[in-house]
Swiss-Prot record:
Converts the free carboxyl group of a malonyl-thioester to its methyl ester by transfer of a methyl group from S-adenosyl-L-methionine (SAM). It allows to synthesize pimeloyl-ACP via the fatty acid synthetic pathway. Belongs to the methyltransferase superfamily. The keyword Lyase does not apply. The gene is bioC. InterPro entries: BioC, Malonyl-ACP_OMT, Methyltransf_25, SAM-dependent_MTases_sf. Pathway: Cofactor biosynthesis; biotin biosynthesis. GO terms for molecular function: carboxyl-O-methyltransferase activity; malonyl-CoA methyltransferase activity; methyltransferase activity. Its EC number is 2.1.1.197. It comes from Haemophilus influenzae (strain ATCC 51907 / DSM 11121 / KW20 / Rd). Keywords: Biotin biosynthesis, Methyltransferase, S-adenosyl-L-methionine, Transferase. This is Malonyl-[acyl-carrier protein] O-methyltransferase. It catalyses: malonyl-[ACP] + S-adenosyl-L-methionine = malonyl-[ACP] methyl ester + S-adenosyl-L-homocysteine. The keyword NAD does not apply.
Length: 260
């Protein structure tokens, strides 16, 4: 199965900018992921308010809203590749700063009690380096909370088109975290969605920004081929077609222990 090791960040920004107005209505899996991450994060947050919280790749503000509803912090900083500051201001009850730029190479000018990210790190070119990079932005015992996707995410589309992201496995994330972090919680699972037609699958991906991976222009011939191949490979007895999501989560504490 073909895969993309990386996608140009300008394509990602363009795809998500186009999808911004439709994202919340169609990104139902991503919404459930933020709820799941937040529910488990509550178990590890210290009592009382935090000094500072950073969310990387905040997008339309799904996780941002939950964070601000359930955490009191003296300073909030949100980041995204798209300039979503106006949209965030309409959603968020607490004041915040916003930095527009690439989350993977975020320039840490201070250290945070919590760095959170949902449905963003799968776009990073070097996720292992990102884990190491987060050490510079976390206080000792600071928390890193991430929701992303595992290796079987959107596997049907990847099989038909030979295009898709190269998703790290849960065991890879565990290995990358083991050096400097205490893994507090992790899990992954699969969710099967059904759609009336393969065309509806493509529309769903467009409305959630995933078409950033598509580096070719669809012709009528390509589209008809995709529809036929998808129906034959992933048609269900109901007449609908399936699409797999593979949510993956972890919460880790920066233990600040140097290798002996």
């Amino acid at each position: 199965m073909g895969s993309l090791t990386s996608v140009d960040k300008s394509r990602i920004r363009q795809a998500f900018q186009k999808a911004l107005n439709d994202y919340d209505r169609h990104a139902l899996i991503q919404q459930k992921m933020t709820i799941n991450l937040m529910a488990h994060l509550q178990d590890y947050l210290p009592n009382g308010s935090l000094d500072s919280v950073l969310e990387l790749g905040c997008g339309s503000g799904m996780l941002s809203s939950l964070l601000q509803k359930q955490i009191s912090a003296d300073y909030w900083l949100f980041n995204d590749l798209c300039d979503v500051q106006t949209q965030l201001a309409e959603k968020l009850p607490q004041s915040f700063d916003f930095y527009c730029g690439d989350a993977e190479h975020f320039l840490f000018l201070q250290q945070f009690d919590l760095i959170a990210s949902a449905s963003a790190v799968q776009w990073f070119h070097q996720p292992d380096a990102f884990i190491a990079h987060c050490k510079t932005g976390l206080k000792t015992n600071g928390l890193l909370a991430v929701a992303t996707f595992g290796e079987d995410n959107l596997k049907e589309v990847r099989q038909i088109t030979n295009i898709g992201l190269n998703y790290p496995t849960l065991s890879q994330w565990q290995t990358w975290l083991a050096k400097d972090f205490e893994l507090l919680w992790c899990e992954d699972f699969k969710v099967i969605l059904d759609f009336d037609t393969p065309l509806d699958v493509l529309k769903h991906l467009k409305y959630t920004g995933v078409t950033a991976t598509n580096q070719k222009n669809w012709t009528r011939k390509n589209l008809n081929g995709f529809i036929g191949d998808y129906l034959s490979a992933f048609g269900m007895p109901s007449g609908k077609v399936r699409l797999t999501y593979h949510p993956l989560f972890f919460i880790a504490r920066y233990s600040h222990i140097e290798n002996q």
